[in-house]
């Protein structure tokens, strides 16, 4: 069984322009079309200052394809133009646990959920 890869882009937004929105849409469309794409979730801090876009993938091959996508490379060159600050976190979800009642979308599609719902408890890495 392969593990789930979570790619988080945590950022403090700056000023967006037309080029940002165009590239952002193209990147989202490309990412969601990758064979290993599971889902994307977006979170905002309680004070609204920070945002977190979390992309879930089935494999590193998909993560690497996104990293090499030409529009993504252009956006990376302009990061200071659109963001006050940012951090990238790429993590491998090797385990998860809970009572089985939380209907979190990426877990519904994940082989990790099926593995862990058989009653074994594990820890989050």
Positions of PLM-derived features:
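Short S/T/G/P-rich N-terminal loop/turn motif that feeds into the first structured element of a domain
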Residues: 1-51, 62-65, 84-125
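An amphipathic, aromatic/His-enriched active-site/gating alpha helix that lines ligand/cofactor pockets
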Residues: 56, 60-89
